[in-house]
Regions:
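Loop architecture of class A 7-transmembrane GPCRs
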Residues: 44-51, 121-137, 142, 170, ...
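Seventh transmembrane helix
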Residues: 299-308, 325-373
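Helix-to-loop junction signature of class
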Residues: 65-68, 106-123, 137, 144-151, ...
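Intrinsically disordered regulatory tails of 7TM GPCRs
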Residues: 1-52, 208, 256-287, 347-389
Length: 389
C-alpha cells in the first residue's frame, strides 16, 4: 500500500518492489549498468548523462497534482474545523471522518509537494537528506494505513448503530470513538515503524554534478515482498470485504424498515412518532455517503494495487511513465475527494461548510461554539447522535 511518490530512482524501480517512485526518464538498461559499475565494484564510477522529465510531463503533472493538492488540503482542513467547532456535527461517525481527513492530509502533505518538485530536479536527486528520506516514507505509509483503518472504523460504527440500536447507545458514543481513533493511530504508527529503518540514501553520479544522492530501499526487493502483501491484505482487501458484508447487512435492515413504512401507509396506519421516519431517512443518507466513500477508495486505489501485484509476479515489470503518473494521481485524488463527497451528499455537512465559510456573522448565528464545549453532551441525545452524520 505504498505511495512514496518521488523517492526511488528508476533503477531501483526495476529491481525493487515499489512502483510509484519513478522519477527518471532515462533508459532502465543504462541505469542498471550504472549501478553495476558504481556500487558493486566500488572502484569504477560511471557517470550518467543528466536526465530530466519532458516539458509536457512536467506541465501536466504540476497542474493536475497541484490542483488536487490545494483542493484536498483546504477541503480536509474544512472537515476538521466544522466537526470540531460545530456542536451538532460532533457525532461518532464524524469523529472517524475527522480521523480520515487528518490521514488524507498527511498523505497529501508528505507526497504531492515532493512529487511535483521531482519533475524539476535532476534525475533521481533527493534534496532532503537521510532524515527527510526516513520521515517522508514513514509519514506516507502512516497516512495511507490510518485512512484505511478509519474507513473500517466508521463502517463498523454504522453497522452497530443501525443493526444493533440498543447496543449502540452504549457503544457508539463520541468518547468511545475518540478512544478508538487513538488506538487506530497508535496501531498505524507501530505497524509503519519498520520504515524508519528500511530506507536509506545512496550517492548518484551525473556528469557535471557532484554530491548528489537519492532515497531508496535499504534492503533488496525480496525482503519487502511479505511486508507489501501484508499491506495489500490488511489495508485494502480486508477492509473492502468487511465493508461489503456490513453494508449489505445495513441495507437489509434499512430496506426492511422502508418496506414496513410503505405497508403501513398503504393500509392507512399512521406513524405515531414522525421522528422515527426522520431518523431512518437520516440514516439512509449517511449510509449512502459512507458507502460512496468506500467505493471511491476501492476504485481509486485499484490501478496501483493491480500494478503492484502484476509487477511482483511478472518477469518484465510494467514501468510506463504516464501510467505511473496516472496511478499516483488516482491516489492523490482519493485523499482529496472526500470533502467534496460530504458536501454533495450530506445536507448537514453542506450547511456546516456554508456557515464556516460565511463572513461577518456572530458565533451564535453561524452555530459555532468553543471547542471545549463540544464534548459536553447529555445522555438523552446519544441515541440520536448515532443516527446522524
Amino acid at each position: 500500500m505504498t505511495t512514496h511518490a518521488t523517492l526511488l530512482p528508476s533503477c531501483y524501480e526495476e529491481s525493487d518492489y515499489s512502483t510509484l517512485n519513478l522519477s527518471l526518464t532515462t533508459d532502465i538498461s543504462n541505469c542498471s549498468s550504472f549501478w553495476d559499475t558504481s556500487i558493486k565494484t566500488e572502484k569504477i564510477i560511471a557517470y550518467q548523462d543528466p536526465t530530466y522529465y519532458s516539458l509536457n510531463y512536467r506541465i501536466i503533472g504540476t497542474i493536475f497534482q497541484g490542483v488536487i493538492f490545494l483542493v484536498g488540503v483546504l477541503g480536509n482542513i474544512m472537515v476538521v474545523i466544522v466537526v470540531t467547532k460545530t456542536r451538532s456535527m460532533l457525532t461518532p461517525t464524524n469523529c472517524y471522518l475527522v480521523s480520515l481527513s487528518l490521514a488524507d492530509l498527511l498523505v497529501l502533505m508528505a507526497s504531492v509537494p515532493n512529487e511535483i518538485l521531482s519533475y524539476y530536479l535532476l534525475g533521481d536527486e533527493w534534496i532532503w537528506g537521510r532524515a527527510g528520506c526516513i520521515i517522508f516514507i514513514f509519514l506516507q505509509y502512516l497516512g495511507i494505513n490510518a485512512s484505511s483503518l478509519s474507513i473500517t472504523a466508521f463502517t463498523v460504527e454504522r453497522y452497530i448503530a443501525i443493526c444493533h440500536p440498543m447496543k449502540a447507545q452504549m457503544v457508539c458514543t463520541v468518547n468511545r470513538a475518540k478512544k478508538i481513533i487513538i488506538g487506530v493511530w497508535v496501531f498505524a504508527c507501530l505497524y509503519c515503524s519498520p520504515w524508519l529503518f528500511l530506507t536509506k540514501t545512496v550517492p548518484i553520479y551525473y556528469k557535471g554534478h557532484e554530491n548528489m544522492e537519492t532515497c531508496t530501499f535499504a534492503l533488496s526487493r525480496e525482503h519487502y515482498l511479505g511486508y507489501f502483501f501484508a499491506d495489500l491484505v490488511i489495508f485494502y482487501i480486508f477492509p473492502l470485504l468487511l465493508s461489503c458484508v456490513l453494508y449489505g447487512l445495513i441495507a437489509r435492515i434499512l430496506f426492511t424498515n422502508s418496506l414496513g413504512e410503505d405497508y403501513g401507509k398503504r393500509n392507512g396506519v399512521k406513524t405515531s412518532d414522525w421522528k422515527k421516519t426522520n431518523n431512518n431517512s437520516a440514516r439512509v443518507q449517511v449510509v449512502k455517503m459512507l458507502a460512496v466513500v468506500v467505493a471511491v477508495f476501492a476504485t481509486l486505489w485499484m490501478p496501483y494495487r493491480v500494478l503492484l501485484v502484476y509487477n511482483s509476479l511478472a518477469k518484465e515489470r510494467y514501468m510506463e511513465l504516464w501510467f505511473l503518473m496516472f496511478c499516483k494521481t488516482m491516489i492523490f485524488i482519493n485523499s482529496a475527494i472526500n470533502p467534496i463527497l460530504y458536501n454533495a451528499m450530506s445536507v448537514k455537512f453542506r450547511r456546516a461548510f456554508k456557515k464556516a465559510l460565511s463572513c461577518g456573522r456572530t458565533r451564535q448565528e453561524t452555530g459555532l461554539v468553543p471547542f471545549r464545549s463540544v464534548a459536553i453532551t447529555t445522555r438523552e441525545n446519544v441515541a440520536q447522535k448515532t443516527t446522524e452524520a
